Each structure stands twice: as structure tokens, then as C-alpha cells.
């Protein structure tokens, strides 16, 4: 892929990503696939599967950069992505109940918890309608509980 050979298009964000991530072992093809999950939001009918894959790639990249692996990290990324899209009223094409059930009771390693804390909040929001505003005591407690236990 061109990104792997330092042929980065003149897009500042892409150049910054390539400069930071390719030296850390992230492949250019992964960066290119990452954008697909985000560009689907620009269409009239966003593709739920593509949105979810964008989250899966984001979390797989995050886990790689944190130096940890977990079989459920991509599922966690899908849940996070779908809930963030719904929280911002960008799309309601998918309600992440499958992902929520798959992650129920799963415990993430300490090294991944700064990343998976976002999933704990997404799971909390998925169980409530409408989701609470950011910064409430209940959401803060969710972050603390996840940091201590690693459970979703």
C-alpha cells in the first residue's frame, strides 16, 4: 500500500496518522480500512456493518498501540462505535444489543482499560434511553468500576 512506502496524500490528518502509526507497526492498509467506517456516515443511509467495522478497527489499533490483545476487543469497538453514532443522533440503523450481550461479564486486562472504559460507558448508554448527559455521577462511577474490575 502507498501509505506503507511513505506516499501519503496531502491530507494533514492522514499525514499525521501515518507519521505516528506506521513506525509503530500499523499497516497502511489498516489505516485505509479505518476511514471506510467513518465515511459511511456521509451517505443518506449509513451502513451499520461498515460503521461497526470502523469501531472494530479503531479498537484493534488502540489495543495494538497499548501492547495488549483481547479476543473481544473488536466486539467492544463495534459497541462503542454504534453507541457513539446513536448518542450524537447521526444514525439509528443499529442498536448494539448483540455486542452488549457478547460483552456481558467480560473482563478486560488492566493495560486495555483506558480504552475499554469507553465501552463501559457505551454499554451503560445502550441500557438507558435516552442516555444520560456526559459527566454525571453515574457515568463517573461506571468509569471507576471499570478501571477497578475491567468488566463491562
Stretches found by the model and what they are:
Residues 1-39, 47-152:
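Catalytic cores of Mg2+-dependent Asp-rich isoprenoid enzymes
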Amino acid at each position: 500500500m502507498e501509505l506503507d512506502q511513505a506516499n501519503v496524500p496531502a491530507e494533514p490528518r492522514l499525514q499525521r496518522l501515518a507519521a505516528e502509526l506506521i513506525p509503530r507497526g500499523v499497516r497502511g492498509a489498516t489505516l485505509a480500512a479505518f476511514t471506510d467506517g467513518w465515511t459511511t456516515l456521509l451517505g443518506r443511509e449509513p451502513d451499520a456493518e461498515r460503521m461497526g467495522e470502523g469501531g472494530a478497527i479503531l479498537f484493534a489499533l488502540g489495543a495494538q498501540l497499548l501492547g495488549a490483545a483481547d479476543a473481544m476487543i473488536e466486539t467492544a469497538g463495534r459497541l462503542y462505535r454504534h453507541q457513539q453514532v446513536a448518542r450524537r443522533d447521526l444514525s439509528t440503523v443499529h442498536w448494539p444489543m448483540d455486542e452488549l450481550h457478547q460483552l456481558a461479564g467480560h473482563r478486560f486486562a488492566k493495560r486495555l482499560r483506558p480504552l475499554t472504559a469507553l465501552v463501559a460507558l457505551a454499554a451503560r448508554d445502550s441500557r438507558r434511553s435516552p442516555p444520560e448527559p456526559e459527566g454525571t455521577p453515574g457515568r463517573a462511577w461506571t468509569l471507576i468500576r471499570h478501571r477497578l474490575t475491567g468488566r463491562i
